[in-house]
Structures are given as C-alpha cells and as structure tokens.
Amino acid sequence: METQDFIKNFAAQFDDTDVSEFTMETRFRELDEWSSLNALAILNMISKKYNIVLKADEMKTTNTVQELFDLINLK
C-alpha cells in the first residue's frame, strides 16, 4: 500500500478539508471536520479499498494518518 494513495483515499472521507492539508503526520482527530461519521466512513473505506476490517476500538488507538496506516499494515 502506497502512502500517497492512502492519504488520497483517507482525505476523500472529508468534505471540507482539502487533500493538500493531509500528510502522514496529520492528527485527524484535531481537524474541525472530525466526527464519528468520518470514523465510520474511514473504516468503510479501509474495508472496501484494502480488504481489511478494523474495529472501531482499534481505530481509537490511532491519532495520526501514519498510525492508522501502520495499524492497517499490521493486519
């Protein structure tokens, strides 16, 4: 899985935040737009695009795009 593709797919789950604002260091929970709906959309995206099922509790342990990316790569 390529980091730039992951950032693009991750950013697509946000309506108001431009993809250019996302990096692997982005603390996504601190974004003004962050909500539980984004979390569900991200979990769904990971399932569909990467064929990996993450539980909400697993995602709760991550704060940055990099941490989420690393968690997915462990699966």
Predicted regions and their residues:
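Phosphopantetheine-dependent thiolation modules in NRPS/PKS and related acyl-activating systems
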Residues: M1-W34, N38-N44, K49-K75
